[in-house]
Amino acid sequence: KYDFPWLDKAVALAAKYDLKVIMCTSTATPPVWLSRKYPEILIKNENGTVLDHGARQHASFASPVYRELAYKMIEKLAQHYGNDSRIIGWQLDNEPAVQFDYNPKAELAFRDFLREKYHHDIKALNDAWGTAFWSEVYSSFDEITLPKTAQMFMNHHQILDYRRFAASQTNDFLNEQCLLIKKYAKNQWVTTNYIPNYEEGHIGGSPALDFQSYTRYMVYGDNEGIGRRGYRVGNPLRIAFANDFFRPIQGTYGVMELQPGQVNWGSINPQPLPGAVRLWMWSVFAGGGDFICTYRYRQPLYGTEQYHYGIVGTDGTTVTPGGREYEPVSYTHLR
C-alpha cells in the first residue's frame, strides 16, 4: 500500500511559505518489514557480518528483489508528484556510494558482469587477469568468487574488476531510478548528492541525471594541518577540489548538503567559526556552483543525528549562528 497524505501535507506546508520542494527517493532507508520479509536484500560484509535494520544504507544495490520493490515505490512517487509544480526536482537516494557487498546475489551478479565484459570468453579473462601467475587459471566463470581483499596478495586485476562492478551497480541503480522518474516528470530535474569519494569511480557514471551534486561537511574534528583555526573553519581545499571535480562533468552542479553548524558524527564536533559558513557558501559559488542546499533546516529532537545543528534550533524558530549566515548570502545571490 502506498500512502501519500502525510507527504502531501509536508509539500503543501512548504508551498504555503513559497518554498520549492526537492523530492528524495527513500532507497537509503528501507523499512523494517522489507528486511524481515526479504533478508536476502541485506548487505554482507567481507568478514561475514550482515547489515541489519536500525541504521541506514543496509540494502544491496545488487539485490534483484530490492531493486524491483524500490522501482515500484519510485514509480508511484513519480506518478503522484511528476506533474506537481511545487516540486522542482528530485534527489536520488542519499549520498549513494559504492557498496562492497559479499552477498551470494552480488557474487552471481559479479560473474554476469565478467561474462559480459569478456564476451563469455574465459580465456580472455585469464589473459587480462594474468592468471597464469601463481596457478590462478580459471576454466569457468562459475569458479570465480568475489575477491577476498583481506587475503594477502589477492590478484589485483580481479580486485580492479570487482571495484568496477561495484561502481556499475551504484550507477545502474541511480540511472534506472532517474529514467523511471522522467517517464512522469517532464519539467523536473533529477540529481543526487554524492559524497566526493573520488577514488570509488562512480561519480558521474549515471548519464540520465540532469546534473551532479555533492555533499560537503567542513568541520568535524580534524584540522588537517591548516592551523589553530582549522577545527572551526575546515580546509578550503575540500570545497575547491570538489568544485573542480564536479564542474567538468556536466557544467551545472551544486551542493545538496552544507552544514550550518556542528555535526553529530565527528571525533570532535565544534561550532564553525563566525563567518565560516558564509565563507563556504561563497567558495561554492566562486568555484562555479549553481546552488546550495543545507542539511538541515531544524535540529532534530531525536534520532541518530539529534545533535546535528540546523538553520534553526530544536524549537523550530530560533535561528542558529550558522543559520544567520545563510540569509545575507541568499539575498545577495538572488540579486
Region locations from a protein language model:
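Polysaccharide-binding and catalytic clefts of secreted carbohydrate-active enzymes
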Residues: S35-P39, I43-F241
